[in-house]
């Protein structure tokens, strides 16, 4: 089983797709990595030679921040924004959307399950 950056890549997938299992590598970075290392994107993971795997590992380690390092950096960036009290930090602290999305309706992913708030009672008919 091929391991890159501490992640087991699925054996039967194409290398281009399998690399996207690593946090911090998407389709475009995977394609760039394969182009720079000279590995054919259509190759299946189980067909990779040890030499190609070493090339991929070295290229990724040298050029990209992935997995734990990237997660730590993102978490540190969010913590910093919360500490300095900027608008984005306040939105993170309150658990609301950070990038300007509307919140009167929608935003359920960030806000969580609906909490019903008591509203005005309608006046009865006389």
Curated annotation (Swiss-Prot):
Tell me if Ribosomal protein is a UniProt keyword of this record: yes
The superkingdom listed in its UniProt entry is Bacteria
Q: Per UniProt, which keywords does this protein have? A: Ribonucleoprotein, Ribosomal protein, RNA-binding, rRNA-binding, tRNA-binding
What is a GO molecular function of this protein? structural constituent of ribosome
What Pfam families is this protein classified in? Answer: Ribosomal_S13
Family according to the record: Belongs to the universal ribosomal protein uS13 family.
Quaternary organization: Part of the 30S ribosomal subunit. Forms a loose heterodimer with protein S19. Forms two bridges to the 50S subunit in the 70S ribosome.
Cited HAMAP family: Ribosomal_uS13
Listed NCBIfam families: uS13_bact
Q: What this chain does, per the record?
A: Located at the top of the head of the 30S subunit, it contacts several helices of the 16S rRNA. In the 70S ribosome it contacts the 23S rRNA (bridge B1a) and protein L5 of the 50S subunit (bridge B1b), connecting the 2 subunits; these bridges are implicated in subunit movement. Contacts the tRNAs in the A and P-sites.
Task: Provide the protein name.
Answer: Small ribosomal subunit protein uS13
């Amino acid at each position: 089983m091929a391991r890159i950056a501490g992640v087991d890549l699925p054996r039967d997938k194409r290398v281009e797709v399998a690399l996207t299992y690593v946090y911090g590598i998407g389709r475009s970075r995977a394609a760039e990595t394969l182009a720079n290392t000279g590995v054919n994107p259509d190759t299946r993971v189980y067909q990779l030679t040890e030499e190609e795997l070493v090339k991929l590992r070295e290229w990724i380690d040298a050029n990209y921040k992935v997995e734990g390092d990237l997660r730590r950096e993102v978490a540190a960036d969010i913590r910093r924004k919360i500490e300095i009290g900027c608008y984005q930090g306040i939105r993170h602290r309150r658990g609301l959307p950070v990038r300007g999305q509307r919140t009167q309706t929608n935003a359920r992913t960030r806000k969580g399950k609906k909490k019903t708030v008591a509203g005005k009672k309608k006046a009865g008919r006389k």
